[in-house]
Amino acid sequence: MGKLRAGRLLSAFIAAQPAYDLVELMLTAGLPARLGGRAVEAFGPGAQRLLKDDPWRLLQLSGVEVADADAFARAAIPGVLQADSRRSRALVGWSLSEAARDGHTLCSVEQVTFDLQLHRVADPAQAIADACAAEVVESIDSVVDSGLALARYAEAERSIAEAVHRLTDTATVIGKIRAGKRRKSDVIDPDGLDPVQRSAVNNALDHGVSVLTGGPGTGKSRTVATVVREAERAGKSVALAAPTGRAAKRLAELCDAEAMTIHRLLGVQPRASTSADGTSAVIDFSAGFARGREWPLDQDLVVVDEASMLDVELAAALLKACADGTHLMIVGDSAQLPSIGPGQVLADLIASKAVPVVELATLYRQDAGGAIARLATAVRGGDLPAVDSPDREVVIVPARGSTECAHRVVQLMTDSIPRALGIEAGQIQVVTPVHRGPAGTIALNAALKAKLNPPPTNQSFGRFDPGDRVVATANHLEATPTGFANGEVGVVTKVADKVVTIDFGSGPAEVGGKMLADISHGWAITVHRAQGSEFGAVIVVLPPEAGRMLSRPRVSTALTRAERHLSIVHGAGPAVARAVHDVGSKPRRTVLRDFLG
């Protein structure tokens, strides 16, 4: 071995020594070694020092239980007491983080106190006071709601409100479209817009921030396309963006203009998890984006589609990057599922009445409403009618139990739909509410792979083979030669040298190493993962175990993924009707509406 290579290996070993020491501590505590690697990724090379100073920082990592952090603390600091103030303070943040997993940015003092008592914190009030003093937690006392919030989310919601007011105050009128000579219908003008759609266009051109909402088939896309055209006629530059790659691609096709993911628009870049002194850096919600207050977006008008998917931190980063005078048009269906991350930005903007909102309700798609559009509109309004679809645009397939549900799904995708309707399996997407069980994503993907793309033994690498359909579960815009975004569905084209090449539609992405953990098989995906995308044909499977998870927004989101054909494999009994009739989705507690004033 040459001296140069030996020197590099020695340097690499010395640099990795803190990670080895941390892994040893994890094993001593009875925790998996991989948790040490995750800690180093999250906290940086000083992770061991940080965690020895405060072992309960470990709770900042997703999936870490209180018992895990306690075990690590005993290994890191022999003789440490359960009454340690660092533990009590960390548990306040942990309680609020657990609430954030359910979408809440605000939690009652009573709930946090209950969580602390459950984990044997003797003085919850003092623990809360300590967490607030450390500026990790904020106490919120508002007109709409009161409670505790993680500082990062409170600051994000406050920043959204400030930016909305800033854009509202600095906007100048781009232009205005007027009604042309009415056609005989006395409803639609020569641009193809009805009066309500036209008012949405004028809102976008007149106001700094405006909202357009409505269900499928109501003309949101036509309205947005008109906004883009009118802005460009006025000599203004336009940016089109959406939370997912598929949604951005569809927006580009509808508007005949370039569109991209919000992350790509903002210029995503690696995020530093901690500062040099070990204090958390996550309070800067726009960290990781090149665009921001110092280098704002150049466009005069920014249009964001599928805005129900915006969580508070992404929305805050987007609004922060909008320069004074920018017009921001926010488009989305308020009846869809809220964001995976905390908050309900679209719903709060609508409820606040701080910005002009237009809701489209008239059905235009498919000659005033095909079976898919009619069903979606009914569900949006809380009704579940009998399906009337002689052309088999919507088909209900009853099933008894999860195993039969799974069998029906495989049969529909591999045989019935291609044979009866001429829609190839490559255009069909399975959507399910669950991961586990016979009708969950894991089992369905295994069954569909066995039928559609059984592994060739000489080309396999890990789980993936050429021809596999896959879905991205995280953003990796740094991938080469083409990056990809969370939610993008692609096809594996090559497997070689422990690297999987995937075509996501915008170009090939070479995926290897730790990045592979963020790729899953994609013949069957969850409702949340499907949000923001549309497919030629969709099979929605509703197994019995999904009953308690169903809500009107979840059902509505699932049904509206289909463009040409929708098959519903129904095994959930009366739970579906119950979910549709009762909104069923527990309201998220947020403070944005109050900040908007």
What is the predicted role of each segment?
Residues 2, 65, 112, 160, ...:
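Residue-level signature of catalytic and energy-coupling elements of molecular machines
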Residues 1-176, 180-181, 205:
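Accessory, non-ATPase domains that flank or precede helicase/AAA+ motor cores in DNA-metabolism machines
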Residues 65, 205-207, 234, 296-298, ...:
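Short loop/turn elements that form and flank the Walker-type P-loop nucleotide-binding site
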Residues 190-206:
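N-terminal pre-P-loop "Q-motif" helix
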Residues 182, 186, 199, 334-485, ...:
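Conserved helicase motor core of P-loop NTPases
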Residues 474, 488-597:
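C-terminal accessory regions
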Residues 106, 210-390:
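ASCE P-loop NTPase helicase motor core
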